[in-house]
A protein has these predicted regions:
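Active-site neighborhoods and metal-handling regions in enzymes and metal-associated proteins
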Residues: 1-375
Length: 375
């Protein structure tokens, strides 16, 4: 037995084979970090223990090829395959450089005799891959299979759930520590850096996001500004724990929280709780979205939403819970509910919680106290 074994945590071959048959696909070729990791265990994510395989993906791309009988082939750089390591796949194709990788794939495709077959690829599949297939294999067709992989990854295994819960606890610990240093005068870049440091110190293997805002400032960018008195601070953080992500938001206020802000926040938290309570097997994304809009209307609120949340896993927002989604909830899915409305001169106020869909009632994974913290 090898000293180090890398295996997928949630990949269900039988479910994949069934979905491939339903769609009439004979084989699939995966090239994105999330799906290669998901089907092979190859640690190519930015949140892997060593993210070098992700950083070098332009020179050493990686692929997972899965046939209709469930046979999984990993194609990867030889440098990652040397030594006392093992991957839980059926076959490995290796190469030394990008040119050799292209040649290896070409020969592999020819040996597999893909002529006249339907090959499934992701929408993000590199152009040179489809060109190789068309030039050397003459498949009957190339089909986009994002829907297959998204549906597979949506339902988490017990091992994946443990990873997501650990990632969530890491962020909650980091937020508890951050609250102690949030004070008027601190710069936003400094607070962002402190958030990263604390997530790593609490066990994160990577950073998902550090979406921190002061008042009405743009939270999506790190902007040089200093925190003032009587400002609302949004701490929206996500950690990666060996590729599995979290997404949590809590608020701090530099002063006494205005009564109207406090009551509006409590109202939004109640709406999030009500939507969270509806996360049961069989519930639809469309139905949840419509329910949220009705609650906004009932309470005289303006909705600042294009969705009511998202599933989470190897990506922060895997599938939206929106009016245009066909998602139907199943046990094992992990869903973030996040809802916001406006306050004052443009401040966004609301809440975000993470839930696990079970056979009966949803389980809230997030545990941090909800009220706005005064400092």
């Amino acid at each position: 037995m090898k000293a180090a074994r890398f295996a997928p945590l949630g990949f269900d071959k039988s479910r994949l084979i069934s979905r491939m048959r339903e769609k009439g696909v004979d084989a699939i070729l995966l090239s994105t970090p999330e799906n290669v990791f998901y089907t092979t265990g190859y640690p190519c994510l930015p949140g892997s223990g060593n993210p070098i395989l992700y950083a070098l993906r332009n020179q050493f791309p990686f692929f997972s090829f899965i046939e209709s009988d469930g046979c999984v082939t990993l194609c990867a750089w030889i440098g990652a395959l040397l030594g006392d390591v093992e991957f839980a796949v059926d076959h490995i194709e290796m190469y030394a450089d990008l040119k050799g990788g292209v040649e290896t794939l070409k020969n592999f495709f020819i040996v597999k005799n893909l002529g006249g077959k339907i090959i499934g690829v992701e929408s993000a599949c590199p152009w040179f891959i489809t060109a190789l297939l068309e030039e050397h294999c003459s498949p009957m067709g190339i089909s986009q299979i994002d829907d297959i992989m998204t549906s597979l990854r949506a339902v988490k295994s017990a091992e994946e759930l443990a990873m997501i819960k650990k990632s969530t606890s890491i962020v909650e610990s980091a937020i508890r520590e951050l609250v102690e240093i949030v004070r008027p005068g601190i710069s936003r870049p400094d607070l962002i850096q402190e958030a990263k440091i604390r997530m790593i110190a609490n066990g994160a293997t990577g950073i998902g996001h550090v979406t921190i805002s002061f008042g009405t400032s743009n939270p999506e960018l790190s902007i040089e500004e200093n925190l003032g008195a009587n400002q609302l601070v949004a701490l929206d953080l996500g950690a990666s724990y060996y590729g599995y992500l979290s997404d949590i938001r809590r608020h701090v206020y530099t002063g006494a929280v205005p009564k109207r802000l406090k009551s509006l926040h409590a109202l939004m938290c109640g709406i999030v709780d009500e939507i969270g309570g509806g996360l049961v097997p069989g519930a639809t994304a469309r139905g949840l979205y419509e329910r949220a809009l009705s609650l906004y209307e009932k309470n005289g609120l303006v909705p600042l939403i294009i969705n009511v949340g998202h599933s989470i896993g190897l990506m922060t927002e895997e599938s939206w819970i929106s009016a245009g989604s066909d998602l139907v909830l199943e046990p094992g899915m992990v869903i973030n509910v996040e809802l916001y409305t406006g306050y004052g001169d443009g401040v966004e106020i609301g809440n975000e919680e993470t839930y696990l869909i079970t056979e009966k009632r949803p389980e809230r994974i997030t545990t941090l106290p909800i009220p706005i913290i005064e400092i």
